Structures are given as structure tokens and as C-alpha cells.
Curated annotation (Swiss-Prot):
This is Phosphoribosylformylglycinamidine synthase subunit PurL. It comes from Caulobacter vibrioides (strain ATCC 19089 / CIP 103742 / CB 15) (Caulobacter crescentus). Substrate binds at S97, H98, N99, H100, R119, Q243, E315, S316, Q317, S538. Its EC number is 6.3.5.3. ATP binds at Y55, K94, D498, G535.
Amino acid sequence: MSTSSTPSAKPMAEMAAEFGLKPAEYDVVLKRLGREPNLVELGVFSVMWSEHCSYKSSKNQLKKFPIDGPRVICGPGENAGVIDIGDGDAIIFKMESHNHPSYIEPYQGAATGVGGIMRDVFTMGARPIALLNALRFGDPSHPKTKRLVDGVVAGIAGYGNCVGVPTVAGETNFHKGYNGNILVNAMCVGLAKADSIFYSAAPGPGLAVVYFGSKTGRDGIHGATMSSAEFSEDSEEKRPTVQVGDPFAEKLLIEATLELMATGAVAAIQDMGAAGLTSSSVEMAGKGGVGIELNMDMVPQRETGMSAYEMMLSESQERMLAVLKPGREQDGHAIFEKWGLDAAVIGYTTDTGRLVLKHHGETVCDVPLAPLFDDAPLYDRPWVQPALQPRLDPAAVPAPTNWNEAVLKIIGCPDMASKRWLWEQYDRHVMADTLEDSATGCDAGIVRIHGTGKAIAVTSDCTPRYVQADPYEGGKQAVAEAWRNLTAAGALPIAITDNLNFGSPEKPETMGQIVRATDGMAEACRALDFPVVSGNVSLYNETNGVAIPPTPTVGGVGLLEDYDLRTGFGNVAEGDTLVLVGETRGELGASIYLREILGREDGAPPPVDLALERKTGDFVRGLISSGLVAGVHDLSDGGLLVAAADVALASKIGVTLNATSQTHAHAYLLGEDQARYLIATPDPDAVLEAAKEAGVHANVAGVAGGEAFASDGLFSVSLDALRAAHEAWLPGYMSAPKA
């Protein structure tokens, strides 16, 4: 067997370290093989054992999540999660990160993040119908932030718009904690038939392995390894590890894949994502309990002279690997030719249980699959309990000295300001099934199931400052807010995907954040019957030893049996009464008010009472079904004040809040207590009576009408001033000349 595919003068142990393998891990490789690996084999082991592919530091924590439910068809372990929405239909969805690539090369990093998550979904037989994104950028004053925002947003828009899938929801935050490591989490939702789901396990030996899609180039080599390491000042030199996307090729790939599936020729299928051809071939064979032999000479190549090492580790985009049923190769050939895709039979499944690669007539890799697929190192890393912040007494937190100025500053700060500049670049209505999106005043994006009266609601949520202050409560809150947003839109929450973004798990403090945040998430999922069906873990998000704020992002999916019963907060009318549903203690710890007005980032986050969360949410869904409400908005960042301002802006109507009777008006208006909703109704007596009967706290909070946003005796700003403050920041920031 050839000992090398790409010549190297360095000892293998030194190369292993450069590839991200620890000395102890390399020793395990030697033990598994009984010899020293060659460069191709070392590359294969390094990417499959990377954090990005193996989940070696997080797998033990992920076992805590509930993954089953009456609607779950397929949970974690496949390319995406699958849930049954009735009438023979299924929703397939997943969220995934492209953090490191997007920091190094923002346009391509973000664009290929969108492309990659779509492939995870259509690989399982679904047509993508919605995209979401959760973006975290550094402080606006940081010299790189504006360029990163511009590139990431353009990349998301450029890819999603060209493929023709609407971007319907998302969230965007700014904080200095992301200065050296931004987060780009992309989510895709697809629609499939429940009896036509495709999986990745190769069903037996002797079957043709077909490569189709774009040619393989040298872009993205060791991308998975790069995404499993922390950054330094030299990280921008890693641009060659960032993949380059072609959305038009992706569109062709979607159509060809779905057409191929419809012929019945597909036995197993897998997209080529992180670790490229290595990961796809190893996973298909490993899950099926078979071996696989590939002839690298047959791989379609974009560049001349590529080695087997380069072809196996390339992360060139828009590529698929399929195992076809016996004798069906010609069916595939005709479809690939129709759609203008490169394609070739590059190998066969075997009964050896080994990964064998041949190139130019030589065997350049011959290793057992088991250590690659299901025997990667698994770590139960040491951790320490995160230091927690004390609860802030509302009486000890100063009220604004100038309420009008405070209102405008809060509503216009980077996190609260309108993101219109951003989402107007996304095509939100392509496919013509979007009912609610970022522009309409709704707590979730809503997309109808074409040809039915049903719709799905989708949302993305996390409050990193809560997780920083208390990972356990912050983890609970991320799940609870997703559940609450879907409820406020009129949907029944069904399941979640997640994207766990943290620093280095080798640091006990960071590992403590991971452990406690996932504890909280798991508890919330169980209490709310909100199973985790897919997800992604992104670790080593730190630069020069400084970690990002812990950011476990949750993507939630809910079902509306009748989309005419959807709710938002953009149609509140003159004279509607605003009823606050849920209990208010005035929790100001880790709040927007504390940070933006008082310049503080301290205090315990609002605790999440999951029993109360469920009771209140179930009550609100019942109210929506009864037809008593004109609008619903959940309370989160900025509390009642921001929720009411959102209503005023979306409905283009004034709002007057009643707060003068409160002991601590600033805590009542700006506290961020959980399990609360703002209900607009023409019949407040009926709502209050229903709440009393259900044992749910509710009180009249204000009234809609006029042309001002006000609270008697505290503040009054015109709608025009409120809108100007809300809309001004982001376009002003992006258009300002460099300092």
C-alpha cells in the first residue's frame, strides 16, 4: 500500500498535532491500526475525530435531551429531524453553525452555511420551504463589525434568494463578546411526504456509490478541523479552508435529488458537508454496517493534479453521495445529465467493514470503519459550577432620570432597533406561501402548507446575556421563549432543533456552562413536551483565549391546523385594550434596561417557572382559538415597554400604558419576567374572566389609540419619534463612513 498521497517531510506525529489530534488521540490511532497511518489515513482520522464531526466533548451532554414524541418520525442521528404534521405530510428541519468560516470570509462563510443546511434537509427527501438565521456580531464600534455584518447578510441573501427559498425569521444581536468570533447559525425547514423519508445508512454490500453535483476542488480542505479550533490573530490566513458556494448549482442539485428519489432508485443518500467525501462515505457505510471502497480516479475534479488526501478532505460545495439500488445507475445518469450535473460511480459498498481508497492503481487508504464512525474518543470533561449573579432588588435599581430619553434609547439600541436594513435584503415571499415574516409583526415566521389549510410557525431564540449570568436558567429560557413565540403566533409547539455555541470545552469554566445550559434546556424540553429532533454543536468559539458569551440557540417549529387562526401584533385597532397575561415581579437582572440605560451587565436573569410557562401558554392558545384576541405578543427583551412599543409600531397606532399605580414603575415596565404575553382585545372583561377561571394572572396594562406612545405621568413620545428611533440605527451605522 502507498504510504503517502501528498508528500510530507514531517513526522506523522507532528502532522497529527497540526491536524488537531492530541498526542493521546494519535496513540489511539496507532493502536487501532497497529501501524503508523499514511497522510491520507491521518487526514481521515483527524477530520472524523474532530469536535465538529465526532461531538466528543458534548455527546454525553446531548444524551440528556428528550428526543421522542408522538409526532417524531426521526430524531437526532440523521441529517435532520423529521416530525409528522398529519395528512401524510412531514416537516424536516435542522439548525447548524458556520461561525468560524463566516468570521474569516463573511460572504462565502454565510452563503455556504445556508447551502449546507439546505442540503441536510433535502437529502432526506424534503423540498426546502423556509430559512431562518441567528446572527451574533461584535460591538458596533469594533473595526471589523461593519464589514462582517455587510458580508454575512449579503452572503445569506445571495444564496437563499438565488436558490429560491424564503428567509422568514431570525434574530440579530451585537455584543463585544463576539468581537473576535461572530456566530452565524442557519436553519432550514422542508416539506416531505411522511412515507418517503430518505436515510443515510447503506443497506448492504455490492451497491454502487454515486457522486453527483459540482466538481471537487481544493476549497475547504480541513474546514472541519478549523471549525474545531479556537482563533488567534492569524486566523484570517485560514481563508483557503473556507468553502465557495454556487447557489445556482444548489438549485439544480435540489431538483435532481428530489427527481432521483421519486424514481425509487435511492437506497441511501448523504450530502457532502463537513469533512466532505470522508464524512459522507464513512457515515453511510458505518450506519449500514458495511465497508466501502472508492476509486479516487473517478471523482469529478475541478483542479488538476489533486491528491487522494485533497479529494477526501475537500469541502467543495453542492455535492452529494448516493448508494443506488442494484441496476439503477442508468436512472441516475439520465437525471444528472438532464440537470447538467457532474456524476460518476466512484465505488461500491463491501462486506469488509473497511474504508479502502484507491488512486492511480495504488491503495492509498485501508482502515477499519468502526474507529472512524462510532469509536471516536469520548470525553467526560471536568467542569466547575458557573459563578452566579445575585438577584437584583427592583428597589435598589435606579429608575430613569429622563423617561422619554430612556424609551427612545432602548427602542433604538443595536439589539432592539429595527433590522429592516438586514431582512429587506432577503426574499421573504418567494414560493408564495409566506403568511408572516420579519416585516409583519408576528413572533414567528409562518409558512402555509401549500394546498391545505395548515401552516407551520418557525422561530429562533436565545438570550446570551441570561446564559452568561446563569447558564441553567438561560438554557431553560431559550427553550421557553421559542415555545412562547410559537404560542403567541397561534401555533402548537411541536419540536426543536438547537445550535450550541460555546468556547473551549477543555476549560472547566466553559464546560460548566455547557453542562448547566444543557441541563436547563433538557428540563424545559421535558416540561413543555418540546423534543429535540436535530441540532449542532459549535465549540472552541474563542479568540486569543477569550470565549464568546455562551449561546445555545433554539430553533422551534409549531403547527397551525388552521392558518386563519394565526395571530400577530400588527392589526391592533383603536380602542383595543391591552391585557398583560402572566405574573410580574419586576426582574431587572441581566436586562436590556440595565445594560443600555445604566451601563451595567450584572444581576441574575429572570427565573423560568416551567409549570407556569406551560399553564400560561396553554391559556393563551385557548384564548386565540376562542376568537377573543385582536393581537398577541410575547414579552422578552425590554419587558412590557418594548412589547407595547412593538405593538404601536407594527399596528401604526398609539399605546398608553398604566404604570403609575405600580410601586416600582420602572421594574413593572422594563422587567423581563418570563411566561408573559401582551394580549390586545376588544373585550377585556371576557379575557380577564377567562384568566380568572383558568387561574392565570392577568391585568389591564393599557389601551391602544391616539398618536403617542405613553405612560401617564412618566413618558410620552410621538409615534413618529418612536419610529424614527427604532428605524435609524442600523441603516445609519451601515452607511456611515469608516472612522
